[in-house]
Amino acid sequence: MKNHKFYIVTLCYNCEEYINDCLESIVTQQYDNYKVIIIDDASSDGTVKRIKDFLNKHNHFNDRFNLIENSERKGPLANHIQSLEVEEIKDNDIILHLDGDDLLTCSTSLSIINKNYANNPNHLISYGDYESATGKESICKPWQSNISVSEYIAPIGWIFSHIRTFKYMLWKHIDKKLSFYDEEGKIFTSAGDVAIMKPLLELAGRKRTMFFNKKMYYYRDNTSLNEHNDHLHDQ
């Protein structure tokens, strides 16, 4: 079975209370073909110190981590784009988004995702499912029609949430100017997850999209860091 390389993108802003749990959930995975790209978006608390302390304590993992410290805030979408420009990523490598205040809920998360991609080589993207910190029901549901993403979600709302992964080859084909910038040429400063996933899903189509109904992601929707609660309405 093919063992895909994962690039885990972890974006942080003032999440010192949660970042250790996030990183611990990565290094305890039973799958070891991965690299972690951490971008701290100019946190004003002790997030960066917590990250460096963790990496010093687990220094045998240091070659798998790349910590980038922004000197000024750029916003989630700009950070997502930046994260995929700092490594030499190959077409079939898998990108996984794990926010700094969230965590993977089981040590086999990467193994399960890899197995599904290996068994379904034509699939290019996956999403769902998660456990909510507030106990709210997950919004993730299977995509059950061949109509476009925009048409499908119009009556039911957004359903493509954590746990989100995609093959890098899909990312290369996005029209980034059209997808990520407004009419004035300014990058969207909010709802980065939606801005990224929507064009990827449109490119892949339903038949090359996987839905996981196993909850492999713990989503802290009760923090001030939660992008969906704070900013999604701005998109």
Feature annotation, model-predicted:
Residues 2-235:
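Nucleotide-sugar donor-binding/catalytic module of glycosyltransferases
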